[in-house]
Amino acid sequence: MRRFFLIIFALAALGALAWGVFVEPFRIEVTHTYIEGQVARPLKIAHLSDLHSARVGRRETRLLELLDEEQPDVIIITGDTLTSGFNYQRIKPVLSRLHAPLGVWLVRGNWENESPMHSEHAFYSQLNIHFLLNEAAPIRPDVWLAGLDDPSSGTPNLDAALNMVPPGVYTILAFHAPGFFTQAAGRAPLALAGHTHGGQIRFPFLPVLWLPRDSGHFLEGWYGANGSKMYVSRGIGTSTLPIRFMCRPELAIITIGP
């Protein structure tokens, strides 16, 4: 009997491993949220994070299909587009396929800082991507985006970015590591972050096995403090291990309405 249960356990473990490697990492979940804000008209945001991509593969193809279905006004990427060991040229085919009427906007993650590149603005500009590094720019006249360096591996300068924002406009903060929200809360109505992968590998009734540094106590989804809201994306890709279990990749659609 004991041998029988060991065999059943081994088969279940192999099945879970196969699911985590070959199935779940490609089952991108689209989440929808509507929030109120002082905007002139609704703004539909596609929030992406942690693509960890090196080619247009199965997961990237599915992401592009979903973006085409959702038709967001703007795409905001909160860092970690690449994966360790891959250079920037290999993510060009992925990033060049991202399009939205109000543009694609990107901030650094820890992988970008650990793989430094000269002339980042020029590189992303040729892909029609707006790269923000401790600076702000208008998505449209009534909505500005302030993009920060990665808090976990760089030098974010919140004051420098927000000083560029004119008074009276709706401001979105974008940064990679969500632990920075403890400093940023109260400075803008909405913040977007990633970095955590939602835990990436999770089991029922057990705490999260691993979170990267500077995640704070933030895992995934919505958080609030001092009048600000933050959304933490589970991300698209994987890192360290090519596995997701009970933690599907995510395309977050956030609509801000008046």
Model-derived segments and spans:
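Conserved acidic residues
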Residues: D73-I75, L102, V169-I172, P189
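Active-site-proximal beta-strand elements of phosphoester/diester hydrolases
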Residues: P42-H52, D142-D150, I172-F175, K229-R234
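Catalytic metal-binding/acid-base residues of hydrolase active sites
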Residues: H52, L82, W111-E112, A136-A137, ...
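Conserved beta-sheet core of the metallophosphoesterase superfamily
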Residues: P178-I253
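Mobile, glycine- and charge-enriched loop segments
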Residues: V23-G57, M164-V169, P178
